[in-house]
């Protein structure tokens, strides 16, 4: 059970089954400690998430090189708890987590052109999900000479919350010390307004009508070591940006969302 969730934690005392709790906070039976979000080691290789699995005095390092999201850690902890229940070795579990891969378009870490890195979160978007993704982007360690980009397509189907939600996300980009905001499609103009109103320099904010335009701009602008978060609702088609920026576009059909004929 997720120890970090108050409602779930309350279920522990009434459960008649064997319970293994997991989480990021102290008190969980199985805990992820010393979490580090990285994207490079040595020759600009993918590094992803590093943390330590702690269970009953045993501590084992874990590296999930393909992902960059807190939700991935919770998924790994839940899977580990199941493995522990079936008496699997903690070291073997940690090794298997090295190749953990999320579904396409959900905070997947991809190598980009010019030795850059792309966090592909293009499956869909909402204010809550965008805020969580930007929080991760702000926590990733990059080289001092490199830059972080939030490349955000509009968020659809959020009704009366549309303007406020976009402005809130825009302000989070500034508050998270993200170097540049790239806003794509009409409703994303409120990303721009929110960021600038929060204090972001206008010179660091760019707007484009279409993802193809944003991709063309970024291909010329990005430099070695830069890190880009690309996110947007399905209708924003931000996977088109990722396809232009990924180091191996020939793998787009395998790695990206909406690559079927009905989308292209």
Regions found by a protein language model. Give the residues of each.
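Extended acidic/charged loop-beta regions that coordinate divalent cations
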Residues: 3-61, 103-106, 110
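General small-molecule cofactor/ligand-binding pocket signal
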Residues: 20, 63, 206-208
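Hydrophobic alpha-helical transmembrane segments
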Residues: 72-77
């Amino acid at each position: 059970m997720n120890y970090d969730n108050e409602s779930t934690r309350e279920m522990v005392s009434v459960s008649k089954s064997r319970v293994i709790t997991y989480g990021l906070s102290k008190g969980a039976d199985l805990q992820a400690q010393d979490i580090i979000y990285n994207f490079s080691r040595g020759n600009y290789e993918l590094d992803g998430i590093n943390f330590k699995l702690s269970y009953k005095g045993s501590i084992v390092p874990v590296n999930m090189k393909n992902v960059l999201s807190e939700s991935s850690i919770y998924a790994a902890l839940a899977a580990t708890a199941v493995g522990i229940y079936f008496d699997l070795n903690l070291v073997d579990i940690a090794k298997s987590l090295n190749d953990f891969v999320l579904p396409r378009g959900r905070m997947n870490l991809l190598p980009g052109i010019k030795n850059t890195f792309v966090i592909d979160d293009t499956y869909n978007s909402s204010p809550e999900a965008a805020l969580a993704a930007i929080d991760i982007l702000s926590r990733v360690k990059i080289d001092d000479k490199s830059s972080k980009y939030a490349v955000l397509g509009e968020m659809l189907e959020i009704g009366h919350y549309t303007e406020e939600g976009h402005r809130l996300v825009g302000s989070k980009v500034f508050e998270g010390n993200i170097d540049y905001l790239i806003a794509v499609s009409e409703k994303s103009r409120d990303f721009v307004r929110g960021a600038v109103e929060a204090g972001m320099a206008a010179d660091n904010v760019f707007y484009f009508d279409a993802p193809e335009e944003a991709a063309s701009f970024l291909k010329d602008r990005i430099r070695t070591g830069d890190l880009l978060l690309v996110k947007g609702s399905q209708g924003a088609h931000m996977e088109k940006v990722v396809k232009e920026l990924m180091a191996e576009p020939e793998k787009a059909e395998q790695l990206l969302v909406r690559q079927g004929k009905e989308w292209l």
